[in-house]
Amino acid sequence: MSGLKEYNGCYCESEYEYAFIGFLEAEGWEYSSGNNISRVTKRDILIANDFKKFVADTNLDLTEDEVTQIYDSVRLVGAETDFATLHKVYNWMVNGIQFTPQDGIARMIPLIDFKKDSNKNIFRVVNQFTVEYTNNGQKENRRPDVLLFVNGMPLCVIELKNPADANATIYDAWEQINIRYWRDIPHLLHYCPLACISDGVKTRLGTVRTPYEHFYAWRRVNDGDAVSTLPFEETETMIKGVYAPERFLEIFRDYIYFQDSIYDSDEV
């Protein structure tokens, strides 16, 4: 769908966005514009069709109404704090959500299939996904640059800055996610533990609660590879090393850690 396009010897932000998406497509992600995704309102965060298809395809005994009940349980999640809600949803994503179907026997319903070589998961990269919120009684919106959905749930938010603008830094991208998005659209970040920030030269991975200084550069795709040093090479290395679908799920499941609440820390 997209590739690196040169723009007067450099890259503008919109073309970098589509180049980034093109790299993800090459790794196996399916591209959709947020403008073409069916939602009841722009406050809706989940992609209902993908979520329900995965649950139905992996639980053939469930009725359509039961699948909708599971969807509503995840869609209407609530907890005492933003951090607690994020932790609760992450636990569902990794371990499944408990549900009692019409036979009366409670069981765990997986929301992601972590089995090696699974072909059940739906990997979707989305841009132009407008998220609505209310500010002093007025409807406003935010539009993250790129979101990565697995089975209709946005597991990673990606914020990109113009590689041609020396004043646009990855710190600005970090502030956009970890400050402004938490302030305005926390209902998106409740489902979205991972965060990536990039300006083409520097690309870093963290979580939506990670301090800026702890965001991590992915230097190699595999052990023994040469360290990436060229512009855009670091981006490609991050995408191949982190976002190849099977590897992405492994990182998502095994490398996200929530601090114990007794230490009064909301870091992930």
Please report, for each region that a protein language model flagged, where it lies by residue.
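ATP-dependent helicase/translocase motor core
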Residues: S2-V268
